[in-house]
Amino acid sequence: IGSHTVAIKTKTPQPIMPAMMGIMSITSPNTQEAKGERNPQGTGPYVFGKWTPGQSVTLKRFSGYWGSTPVVEDVMYVFRKESAVRAAMVKTGEADIAPNIAVQDATDPKMDFSYFNSETARLRIDMSQKPLDDIRLRKAMNLAIDLDALRGTIFAAGVVPQTQIVVPSINGHNPRLKPWPYNLAEAKKLVAAAKADGVDVGKEIVIIGRLGIYPNSTEAMEAMHAMLSEAGFNLKIKMMETAGWLNFLSRPYAEDRGPTLVQGQHDNNNGDAVFSMYNKYACEGAQSTTCDSQVEAGIKAATAATGDKRRDTWQEVQRRLHQDIVPDVQMFHMVGFSRVNPRIDFTPSIATNSQLQVSQVKFN
């Protein structure tokens, strides 16, 4: 329309367009061709300095930034896989902020912060593959997991058993749903009933884990492997780096993949369930293995609705998924831990696991 005006048209109604625009990055389409893949250009308060793959990234404050001038002039992101190492670097003054450290490393109340981080952990069940297309087995998996045994040990004591992919603060969360109880005897009965009907319950199921997806991620899969095995399932674990794991998480799925449970963690702090539901549970969702006509219709209706109707429609979709479809082994709404050097004025929040805005950081 003009040099500073853009017209946006959508194929379907988008009542929360302002919220959706708030998570979009703005980048020139000419950036990659002109500057290369490793010299990103954006509209933020910092400019890209240097990238040493697998080691570090540096940023410098942008003097021409259109907004308020941030306090921090230079930034270095250093990558260390081990939580204990990251925590120790802050303690010794080698680093200032270590986001997402493990619960066992958060031992200093003067430096460590605990907070709900908007992440929801689950195992996605590949419902398209036998024997996981049998709902009795999907229910049995949920009944076989002793969530209380995982809390305060492998996971932080403050994690909350989940009933849906979005946290309670998100519009569309259904507060009336109850977490699956731990009932090993009932889980075994469901497995036995499926076996009696000719379901191949002994077929090997592969747990696809991602290294470092959250603290103690490997230990979590090992514990859940033991619990599911006790219920009568035949499983093995494959822990992968992110690139290999993504081949199982997102389309296109390999036709010969077999039955899998994919370790996942989903972050939605954008205020509405729409940012989660299509991708995870629609028939054509990028990470969906389910296709239910009622869920599909509900997602479409809720996306176009406003007010109470929008909330209520999302809540019914959540109910059907939780009670009638069972596409996940449900785990927790997660708690994060971050360590902050006392010289830094910064309080981690629900957003810290997915982004750390240096413009918010000040010095004491």
Q: Residue locations for each model-derived region?
A:
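Gly/Pro-rich hinge or "lid" segments in bacterial periplasmic/extracellular proteins
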Residues: 3, 14-74, 82-85
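Short, well-ordered beta-strand elements
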Residues: 6-8, 44-47, 57-58, 73-78, ...
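A structural "hinge/loop" feature
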Residues: 13-26, 43, 124, 339-357
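Extracellular/periplasmic solute-recognition and catalytic clefts
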Residues: 49-60, 76-129, 152, 159
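Detector for C-terminal structural segments
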Residues: 52, 144-172, 215-225, 250-364
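Short helices/loops that flank or line small-molecule/ion binding pockets
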Residues: 83-94, 135-136, 222-231, 244-258
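Structural transition elements
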Residues: 132, 161-194, 211-220
